[in-house]
Amino acid sequence: MRRRTMLLSCTTVALALGATACGGGDPVTTAGGGDKPLSGQTVSVAGSWSGAEQKNFQKVLDAFSAKTGAKTQFTSTGDNVSTVVGSKIEGGNAPDVALVPQVGVLQQFAKKGWLKPLSASANQAVDTNYADVWKSYGSVDGSLYGLYFKAAHKSTVWYSPAALEQAGVKPPKTYKEMLASARAVSDSGLSAFAVAGEDGWTLTDWFENIYLSQAGPEKYDQLAAHEIKWTDPSVVKALTTLGALFNEKGLIAGGQKGALGTDFPGSVEQVFGPDPEAGMVYEGDFVAGVAKDQFGRTIGEDAEFFPFPAVDSGRAPVVSGGDAAVVLKDGGNQKGAMALVEFLATPEAAGVWAEAGGFVSPNTKLDLAKYGDDTTRRIAQSLIDAGDSARFDMSDQAPAAFGGTKGTGEWKLLQDFLRDPSDPEATAGRLEAAAAKAYQG
């Protein structure tokens, strides 16, 4: 599930949209004007971004204003995008554009009739600038509703170069090599991996990368849609692979018990903090921001990554997430809203944020030179190279009761599995029982 703003403190504020949300803030309005197509109009936008992300997206909105003459008003909803936007739609005060972070939310909004299909121009831009898989994740029943503007690459293993050098190993190319490197790191005096078991979503990401590589994209899609059961042999195999790592002594900082008491920021600290306990931490590209901003690491020098390696004979996985721009039917400025989404589909818009940093785009036409450092370029290139084999975070596609609720569903069951990984088949059975209930609901 979504985790970007989990690193931020929560403040209850009154949103301009008329609801209360964690992480929200006062709306920011940009000035338009001039003799331009949308002069005198205002486009209201709602999304989860706050802090540096909101500031950088504002630069994109400013570029839109300069191009069209429209004013823009952005309101941060915190992590409660679906709740805040949904309540305002039902209350007759919808924003013009919303940025939704989950496929399931986009599908929910579309099926309720809240979204306007994107224009022919937006469709053409997506066909030209994006791999087909991104159009698929933005579509419901054959109509395109969502434009994926910002992506997250969740198949990156971050490491301390000093730790790997001390162990005498180089970044691995296969999962088998990664385990061998992990044992060498452990033998050199550090634990191999920091695992944020307190945050169940990190465990779903571990599973998804192993499963996508082992079982392949077709099976991944079937499991994401619950077209096959979680008791399928492919699931048991992936759990067995993951369980072997969890269970091997010395590979996890603090052991299984310690991992269950470690949250995501804590796992990054265990590798990149002042007193390192581990050499590697698996999670998405957002690890870099924590390592840099909280622990003063220089990305590409004393904090690096390697792609999550291929498992068995499979292909190296690319699991992603992203934020899709949608146009609300009940918004007051349909023309301006559609123009904004059409702008977001361009490499010009993506380039604005790419230059600001903290951003990866699935837009294949974005010049990689726009990114400010080689590490981000590598991450972006990997996402583009994956093409249609990239897959969206599976738990973000599932009903929240199964894939996105703390203390229940997949999060809780994989925490139980981390605690005791001795019976993958039993865990698969419990996952299937929880999934069946959630998907029926």
Regions found by a protein language model. Give the residues of each.
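Conserved N-terminal structural module of periplasmic/extracytoplasmic solute-binding proteins
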Residues: 2-19, 23-107, 124, 352, ...
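Extracytoplasmic ligand-binding clamshell segments of periplasmic binding protein
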Residues: 217-294
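Short, solvent-exposed loop/beta-turn-alpha elements that line the ligand-binding surface or hinge
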Residues: 36, 119-130, 197, 214-238, ...
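Extracytoplasmic/periplasmic solute-binding protein
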Residues: 145-149, 179-237
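Extracytoplasmic/periplasmic substrate-recognition and gating elements
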Residues: 62, 293-359
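C-terminal capping/gating helix-and-loop segments adjacent to ligand/active sites or protein-protein/ligand interfaces
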Residues: 359-365, 380-435
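Hinge/lid segment of periplasmic solute-binding proteins
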Residues: 103-155, 179
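Short helix-initiation/N-cap motifs at beta->coil->alpha
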Residues: 76-84, 103-104, 175-179, 256-270, ...
